[in-house]
Curated annotation (Swiss-Prot):
This is Adenylate kinase. One of its GO terms (molecular function) is zinc ion binding. It is found in: Cytoplasm. One of its GO terms (cellular component) is cytoplasm. Pfam families: ADK, ADK_lid.
Length: 220
């Protein structure tokens, strides 16, 4: 089973993606994780990508395509892809790769949240720069305000988590996703999921769909 999962900033798509990985034994491919790894390692490519994110801009397709296709070559099947593709050019790159390797996508899940909810969720996020632990000032606060529970380091807010940047990211995302959504609707694999509510509530909107797909595959 191969899955695409989308959602604007703060939609919780990565949290749901990891639940999907645990339940169905898929490989998790996250464009965000691949990008953050490059940034954390301070590579020239990472520094270039950080500059785009700090301005609230999307990273160029050529860079993202290279990261994703490189990962796909090592995985090939039974994966969930988080946050990719986001532009028509990325769709073309992905579709060309999948066609050349005889791979199909079973479902494209779009988790929707409003702009207001996106800002509330994302702007409250805090990151430990030392160990990578993630907190939220409202939903998952550290025991000592501003300090990591794991290593005690001072927590920081990522540049792209500031409210004004979140709003810009959200609007860019929604605009760019219009043709992507239309493409997967034509493929008859697009499913829109209400992302409002807690993690378990959203999960129970997703799980029955994937159980059905998995059971359908088992019967073929």
């Amino acid at each position: 089973m191969n899955i695409l999962i989308f959602g604007p900033p703060g939609s919780g798509k990565s949290t749901q993606a990891r639940r999907i990985v645990e339940r169905y034994g898929l490989t998790y491919i996250s464009s965000g994780d691949l990008i953050r790894k490059e940034i954390a390692e301070g590579t020239p490519l990472g520094r270039e990508m950080q500059a785009y994110l700090a301005r609230g801009d999307l990273i160029p397709d050529t860079i993202v395509n290279t990261l994703i296709i490189s990962k796909l070559r090592r995985v090939r099947k039974d994966f969930i892809m988080d946050g990719y593709p986001r532009t028509p050019e990325q769709v073309i790159a992905l579709e060309n790769y999948l066609y050349d390797h005889g791979i199909k996508i079973d479902v494209a899940i779009d988790i929707y949240v409003s702009l207001e909810e996106s800002i509330r969720r994302v702007s409250g996020r805090r990151i430990c720069p030392k160990c990578g632990a993630v907190y939220h000032v409202e939903f998952n606060p550290p025991k000592i305000p501003g300090r990591c529970d794991v290593c005690g380091a001072e927590l920081v807010q990522r540049e792209d988590d500031r409210p004004e940047v979140v709003e810009k990211r959200y609007r860019i995302y929604m605009k760019n996703m219009e043709p992507i959504i239309k493409f997967y609707q034509k493929q008859r694999i697009y499913v829109k999921i209400n992302g409002h509510g807690n993690i378990d509530e959203v999960w129970e909107r997703i799980r029955p769909l994937l159980d059905y797909i998995r059971n359908r595959e088992a019967m073929i």
